[in-house]
Amino acid sequence: MFYDTAKIYVKAGDGGNGCVSFRREKYVPNGGPDGGDGGRGGSVILVGDEGLNTLLDFRYKRHYKAPRGEHGKGSNRHGKAGENLYIRVPVGTVVKDEATGEILADITEHGQEVVVARGGRGGRGNAHFASPTHQAPKFAELGEPGEERWLLLELKLLADVGLVGYPNAGKSTLISRVSAARPKIADYPFTTLTPNLGVVEVGEGQSFVMADIPGLIEGAHAGVGLGHQFLRHVERTRVLLMVLDMSGFEGRDPVDDFEVLLKELKLYNEQLLTKPLVIAANKMDTANAQENLEKLKQHIAGKYEIYPISALTGEGLKPLIYRLWEIISTLPRESLEVKPQKVIKEQPEEGFVVEKVDGIFVVKGKKIERLVAMTNLDNEEAVDRLQRTFTRMGLEEQLKRAGVKPGDLVRIGKFEFYFVDETEGLEEE
């Protein structure tokens, strides 16, 4: 079964907690703090794999979590970093943030790695917080939480030649004739509901990839007949091979079919018409085929190359395949990379902003959110340090400028506090 979309949840590992420890050694009564740092959490990394051609695996497993870093230990021993979690995806996968719809990455090469969730920083041990005025700190930092998000994966096939045409035009028969692909073939429309890939051997060491795109109908550019899902794959092909039914079956007119297909490609993405386009006039073994072929040639008037074929009998396939190979050989290997957009707006490392949202004063800033997340709010010394840091950063002043009053809720990251007053500052909810 072919799956070309998937939704998965990724969670990077939290950083390990810093350690609270004091040196204990014979004849050294005041050894001082020696708590080590926690290790960094593992990141979640997507890796392009040319051996995969479907997102089927993500139908059965949707949640992925990297291990956290180890906690720090006494004697200044640091925790081990968590191992990164590597998830293999097909080449041609576009990765989007589910919450924003923005593009994180476009995986276009085998072995390409993309970090989609970064592991949290390890917390610092109490040895870091010793000073001449505070020689025995009894607190350490917690590990920073790892990033987490839902991702939308969208597979766009990477193929040299893409077959486009109406349902039942003979595309599946064609690809089964020229490659080892074995798509479902039957005498009714929409037999092919998922793309099929086949490798076409031209000569010794020479081959190209052909994609059988499910049939298009009028209105496909607007999503009619699952058109958006099918046309998405055409974008990644280097050459378009339009397969037209010359038999005139059920009153079909190859000239009309040609014009409708051309229009659908243009309306979906005008850039598709800049690709080389070759026409395969199929089913030339039928009664009215030659007459319809002459009409098509007159209509096109040499604008596109036409190759009369019969996918059923194999007639005319060899010249068509060699011509496709000639065209492919002259085309440069274009970069198919989609320019990633910023998934999260860059926040200043030092600064922060205060916004009032639904009656709650929300503080946003990379450093201040990390500071709160890595503070052990059950430890009085750690909370005192947090309060002093807030004062140095000017948090209370900014909250007052935003209109905060005693008793109002203040949210920083995932934590909420009650604003008390100028002297007491913030009190955890």
Swiss-Prot record:
It is found in: Cytoplasm. Gene3D superfamilies: GTP-binding protein OBG, C-terminal domain (3.30.300.350), GTP1/OBG domain (2.70.210.12), P-loop containing nucleotide triphosphate hydrolases (3.40.50.300). PROSITE patterns: G_OBG, GTP1_OBG, OBG, OCT. Its main location: cytoplasm. It comes from the Bacteria. Residues 344-421 form the OCT domain. Keywords: Cytoplasm, GTP-binding, Hydrolase, Magnesium, Metal-binding, Nucleotide-binding. One of its GO terms (cellular component) is cytoplasm. One of its GO terms (biological process) is ribosome biogenesis. Its cofactor is Mg(2+). Its EC number is 3.6.5.-. GO terms for molecular function: GTP binding; GTPase activity; magnesium ion binding. InterPro entries: G_OBG, GTP-bd, GTP-bd_Obg/CgtA, GTP-bd_prot_GTP1/OBG_C_sf, GTP1-OBG_CS, GTP1_OBG_dom, GTP1_OBG_dom_sf, OBG_GTPase. Residues 159-329 form the OBG-type G domain. Mg(2+) binds at S172, T192. GTP binds at residues 165-172, 190-194, 212-215, 282-285, 310-312. Residues 1-158 form the Obg domain. Belongs to the TRAFAC class OBG-HflX-like GTPase superfamily. OBG GTPase family. An essential GTPase which binds GTP, GDP and possibly (p)ppGpp with moderate affinity, with high nucleotide exchange rates and a fairly low GTP hydrolysis rate. Plays a role in control of the cell cycle, stress response, ribosome biogenesis and in those bacteria that undergo differentiation, in morphogenesis control. Monomer. This is GTPase Obg. The lineage of its organism: Bacteria, Bacillati, Bacillota, Clostridia, Thermoanaerobacterales.
